[in-house]
Amino acid sequence: SGSSGMVLGQYLDIESEKLNSDLDLDDMEKIHSLKTGKLIQASILMGQLESSLDNKKQIMLSDFGSKIGLAFQIFDDILDETGDSSVLGKSIKSDIKNHKQTYVKVIGLEQSNFIADQLAAESIGILDSMGLGESISTLKSLAEYMVNRNR
């Protein structure tokens, strides 16, 4: 997650902001996947280190973390555009003011919502396919919260 993960994602994000350059969807996905996707992925993987999960399930959890992390960041972009500052506890539309590239700016609000929902559904599908029953209910709740939050 270091120089080829979160750090690289943050660097690319800062550079695009400094250059005030427009990014395409692939660029946005790369930046957000490296930043928030890798952060959530690492958190999920650290949480399972002491488990007895086999390698296949560990890979599935890694994929879950990456997808739900990306969904979280997309939804964060959406909230910056549509949220209520009194609920969020921070000013809205700060991404626009700071010339940040966001999913909403690149592909619009409707498509951003669609992609975030799709990633959340894929994430939950990964968990369901692991066959671990109730032991993953907290992760499923986390995934649902990440894209249904209002702050």
Spans of features found by a protein language model:
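All-alpha prenyltransferase/terpene-synthase fold signal
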Residues: 1-151
